[in-house]
Curated annotation (Swiss-Prot):
Keywords associated with the record: Aminoacyl-tRNA synthetase, ATP-binding, Cytoplasm, Ligase, Nucleotide-binding, Protein biosynthesis
One Pfam family it belongs to: tRNA-synt_1c_C2
HAMAP family, alphabetized: Gln_tRNA_synth
Signal sequence, start to end: none
Protein location: Cytoplasm
Designated name of the protein: Glutamine--tRNA ligase
Annotated organism of origin: Buchnera aphidicola subsp. Acyrthosiphon pisum (strain APS) (Acyrthosiphon pisum symbiotic bacterium)
ATP-binding keyword on record: yes
Length: 571
């Protein structure tokens, strides 16, 4: 995948950048990825990360990592470390040191003082509820705060008192003085500073007043020399305030904001608030539960950095909000794993087969490829004995003409091995099949049977070549395509989003995995033949009990000839 070429050819933002660079030959492209450290990154953030870092590489520019840490109530060091890890995992490196908006708090405070001295900001004592009430609606203009027309000197003194901690939380705030009748609600005297008495993870207890995101963001962009500030469409109206603040302060550099559509993914919730509800109600295990699209969850499910970057490249960058097919994301990882995953056999729901014409000490070894189309990936040994396991779904007791696998009185070929014939069954006290008695035709290794009819092929594992394992079969968490739009999204939980199976993998393969787990070499991917692509669950696996997560099934349902997206209003 030539990501740079794809970006240059298909990205409307590139057209803007090309124009800017052509008009100003001395301009160097400079962008940033500015997450708030109040949660874990998800697939939507990956789109922004890929866009910013790939553009910086394409234009030989720079991309900063800046944490917009202006709300210590919701922020945590663990989110900072997780975000840095995710960006590195995707294969990107930010320019220079990690930056924090909190590094600029003194400078931001000085810019706020400038606005006060120009009569463009005032200290207000309305409560949060009163401010909301005074702001008006889309159809009705707002009304001025009774504190709006204080003198400049009074506002200077009050803002200094806010900084010193002389007011309690909610008792005072600093607001921009713009226009309470503006058609844009965001321009109706927005709050610029509020009081929060809590220890900040970077500045400790140095500050008790904190700038709002809209105030800190544009000024931080300016301080860092950002040329193109890229954000999603929900910040489109914020651009009015972004430009107003820059225009009315003494900044020396004027970045430009451009918006693109956010990533909306079928059957998924991206809202941090809603994901937390799912966790609190024990519907999912945590932020890395493979049923949600956080990057840590996708990593645990078996998605690779290249598959996620390929997905972001395929969906492109537009100004139209669309609902992206989940099958496109699956297509990207399936296509990669088809080339790279080791082939092996696993039995998820075992049923025993006894081959009565073979001795109990019968043993035969077969050398099988790790990948059918890539000899360089090597081979491994499997053994064949008189007792083997197949998957319960590969046998049917009652005759069914359409059923092409093993059934009583019929034959089947074992993968890489012989043809067997099912003659009778044994059941336990509950009526469940416990044993299938079969005849093994030893003249059929690599040969057709006497009737010249090749039967279907199923996978198997010798009883003497098994290692027990748990298999987690993940499906969509929701049973509707756009749960984000539902008022009560919890009504649409898929009760079968996780099914656990307990079975076997090939012993030698399992032992190799156990060695790698102890060495923390945990990115191990397999195609369990006829089942799907799986990875080792590096969180739940123990040395004596391996756990595998299904990454994706074998069948590709996405039409790769055209990118299918759906209007986000459709369910």
């Amino acid at each position: 995948m030539d990501t740079k070429k794809e970006i240059k050819n298909n990205n409307f933002i590139c057209q803007i950048i090309n124009k800017d660079l052509n008009e100003n030959k001395n301009l160097s492209f400079y962008t940033r990825f500015p997450p708030e450290p109040n949660g874990y990154l998800h697939i939507g953030h990956a789109k922004s990360i890929c866009l910013n870092f790939e553009l910086a590489s394409l234009y030989k520019g720079r991309c900063n990592l800046r944490f917009d840490d202006t709300n210590p109530l919701k922020e945590n060091i663990k989110y900072i470390e997780s975000i840095k890890h995710d960006i590195n995992w995707l294969g990107y490196k930010w320019h220079g040191n990690v930056r924090y908006a909190s590094e600029y708090f003194l400078k931001l405070y000085q810019y706020a003082q400038e606005l006060i001295k120009k009569g463009l900001a005032y200290v207000d004592h309305l409560t949060k509820e009163q401010i909301r009430e005074y702001r008006g609606t889309l159809n009705t203009p707002g009304k001025n705060s009774p504190y709006r027309n204080r003198t400049i000197q009074e506002n200077i003194e009050l803002f200094e008192k806010m900084k010193k901690g002389d007011f309690s939380e909610g008792e005072a705030c600093l607001r921009a003085k713009i226009n309470m009748s503006s058609s844009s609600i965001i321009m109706r005297d927005p709050v610029l500073y509020r009081i929060i008495f809590i220890k900040h993870h970077q500045t400790q207890n140095k500050w008790c007043i904190y700038p709002m995101y809209d105030f800190a963001h544009c000024l931080s962009d300016s301080i860092e020399g950002i040329t193109h500030s890229l954000c999603t469409l929900e910040f489109q109206d914020n651009k009015f305030l972004y430009n107003w603040i820059l225009k009315n302060t003494s900044v020396k550099h004027y970045p430009k904001q451009y918006e693109f559509s956010r990533l909306n993914l079928e059957f998924s919730i991206l809202s941090k608030r809603k994901i937390k509800i799912l966790i609190d109600k024990n519907i999912i295990e945590g932020w890395d539960d493979p049923r949600i699209p956080t990057l840590s969850a996708l990593r645990r499910k078996g998605y690779t950095p290249s598959s996620i970057k390929n997905f972001c490249q395929k969906i492109g960058v537009t100004k139209q909000n669309n609902l992206i097919e989940f099958s496109m994301l699956e297509h990207c990882i399936r296509k990669e794993l088809n080339q790279t995953a080791i082939r092996t056999m696993a039995i998820l729901d075992p049923i025993k087969i006894f081959l009565y014409n073979l001795d109990s000490n019968y043993k035969e070894e077969f050398i099988v490829p790790n990948h059918p189309n890539n000899p360089e990936m090597g081979t491994h040994k499997i053994i064949f004995t008189n007792t083997i396991y197949i998957d319960r779904s590969d046998f049917k007791e009652k005759y069914d003409k359409k059923y092409k696998r093993l059934k009583l009185g019929e034959k089947i070929r074992l993968r890489y091995s012989y043809i067997i014939h099912a003659e009778k069954i044994e059941k336990d006290e509950y009526g469940n099949i416990s044993n299938i008695i079969c005849y093994c035709d030893l003249n059929t290794l690599g040969r057709k049977p006497k009737d010249n009819k090749n039967p279907a092929v199923i996978h198997w594992i010798s009883e003497k070549n098994t290692l027990s394992a748990e298999f987690k079969l993940y499906d969509q968490l929701f049973n509707i395509k756009n749960p984000e739009q539902q008022e009560n999204f919890l009504l649409y939980i898929n009760s079968k989003s996780l099914i656990k199976k307990f079975g076997f993998i090939e012993k030698k393969i399992g032992e190799e995995i156990q060695k790698k787990i102890s060495n923390n070499n945990i990115e191990i991917f397999f195609q369990f033949e006829r089942i799907g692509y799986f990875c080792i669950d590096f969180i739940d696996s123990k040395k004596n009990q391996l756990v595998f997560n299904r990454t994706v099934g074998l069948r590709d349902t996405w039409d790769s000839k055209k990118i299918k997206t759906k209007n986000i209003t459709n369910n």
